Structures are given as structure tokens and as C-alpha cells.
Amino acid sequence: MEPVEQQPYSEYTIQIEAEGFEPKEIAGSQVLADTLSRQPTTLNVMESGETFQRIVIPPHTLFYEYPPKIEEAEIKPINENGEIVLSKVVIPEYIVVHDGPVNDSAAGNYYVRYKDYIKNVASSEIYATWPDDTIRANILAIMSFTLNRVYTEWYRNKGYDFTITSSTAYDHKWIYGRNIFASIDRIV
């Protein structure tokens, strides 16, 4: 699918301040017409001096060209030395998201609730204005791919300490700090 010429959402910058807490700014929060969303965030307690946290939300995957998916073999070799495959399908409470390409050692790892990960990816890869059945079908595809990464311990078997990446070259687009659309939240 080619990116559209006109951006179908507005971007807002949200500034959050509360006494005793570090101020935070979230730039690029995406707002679709007639669509509710929530901007999850937390504030850190101010310790010494004033610090400022800024989160920048990049463009939506349907509006911007991210790296294309790197092809993987449809049938993966099994029983490699030291390989771990879970004995049963498990829906985890948390997954570890590596916020960058696989080999980027400077990218952070985030412990994210599985359900919140699915909501974030869906909000990053599909539009919340789509029909409910279309949203549901896409969410099921996202869940299937993600659970495959969990079940096969895909990255851990390669020596990494995370479950999945945020890079579209390998996995889904997960965006740290992004807003979640109500229609997607409800379906997940």
C-alpha cells in the first residue's frame, strides 16, 4: 500500500506539568476526525533540579515509508543447537520490545504489557476509522505474528534479550509513547 498524499490525521503537541513532577512534552500525537483516543503517559517525580522529557511520535506507517519487511523463510529449520521453543502456546502478560533494528545495541528495551503492545501496533499500522471487522481482522493478524515470535523465542534463540523489535524491517511498528485509538482499544 502506497502512502497517501494528504495526511489523514492531525498532529498535536501535548505539554504535561504537575507540581512535584518533571514536565513532559509529547510531540506528534495523532488525532483522526471524529475518533477518540487516549494519550497514556506517566510523570517522573522531580528529584533535583528541573529536567524535561520530550517524546516524539513519528508518522503513521500508512502515511510514511518505513523499511520494508526483510524476507524470512516460510519454514524455519528446527532442532538447532540450544534452540528453545515453548511447549505450549502462551499469551504472555509482558513482552520485551527492542525499540530499533535487531543489531542496534543503543536502542532501548521496554517491558510492555502484551495487550498494550497490540493496541500500540494496531494504532500505528491501521486507521481507527476503518470498519470494526477490518480492525478486528488486522488485530488478529498482529496477535498471530506476535505470538509466533513469543512461542518460537525467535530473538532469544539468536542470543538477544528481547521478544520483538519495533522495526518494520523485522516485525511490527511499535511506537514508544504513542496515543491509542478508542475503537482499537475496545476491540483488543
Residue positions per predicted region:
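Conserved, single-site charged/polar hotspot
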Residues: 2-188
